[in-house]
Amino acid sequence: MEAAAAIAPQRAWGKGRLVAKTGGARTRIAGLYQEGCAKIRLPRTFDASMEAVLINSSGGVTGGDRLAWEFEAGEGTNLTLTTQACEKVYKASVDTAVVATRISVAARGHVDWLPQESILFDRSALSRSLEVDLAPDASFLALEAVLIGRKAMGETVRSGLFRDHWRIRSGGALVHAENLALAGDIAALGSRRAVLDGAVAFATLVYVAPDCEALLPRLRTSLAEHALSGVSHFAVNGRDKIVARVVAADGFALRKILIPLISHLRKGASVPRVWTL
């Protein structure tokens, strides 16, 4: 009798690419590519900006999945990138899920990178990267929010792997870099005062633009009552940036803090509508 052939688990793979340009005083589509589980939808907007909603049609990621996103915002464009739903990161039996995002913004362009939260499940494994190249006079807002399980669903996360790698450059010069790693006993790590102090929801906001100093006071006032959260202003390689770290007890509390901050940095515009659907 012949031995049964080993069958590798099916894994999700997807690649999406969007190019935006200006035309008729509006930001318009110049190129769109979708493959595998990566989908991009462009809802109607009622101003000069463009909004793109990213969809992972596999319904989440697990070990071995691969997703790649690439976005080009042309001169003078205004592009908002968000996701249809929170990205669920499920238990990984083998390997690590990899999600890579690349964004380039040309002269006088602006991009808001505002995905909804990533939800980590117990024994999940995700390695994520964000690479951004800005023209010297382009501006950029980025948010990444993470939930270590969902309190309302009674979920707990004991162990797993989460890596987040950011590199933001302007005119080729590095203006922001960070490497976050939660590995092994995430529950014990997150309980430390210097990490999350037992909280299960956290986010990072980065804003690169000339008007950082004017926006800073209101951000500091908004975060003053949240002991584990804070905001700072830096000048790096000729560019101003704001970095805000937000920690909350759960996802609902995190959104209550984040939405006013995002609206302030977007000059009064709220979060993408898909966040509220």
Swiss-Prot record:
Its main location: cytoplasm. It comes from Sinorhizobium medicae (strain WSM419). It is found in: Cytoplasm. Belongs to the UreD family. The gene is ureD. The keyword Cytoplasm applies. GO terms for cellular component: cytoplasm. InterPro entries: UreD (IPR002669). GO terms for molecular function: nickel cation binding. This is Urease accessory protein UreD. Keywords: Chaperone, Cytoplasm, Nickel insertion. Required for maturation of urease via the functional incorporation of the urease nickel metallocenter. Transmembrane segments: none annotated. UreD, UreF and UreG form a complex that acts as a GTP-hydrolysis-dependent molecular chaperone, activating the urease apoprotein by helping to assemble the nickel containing metallocenter of UreC. The UreE protein probably delivers the nickel.
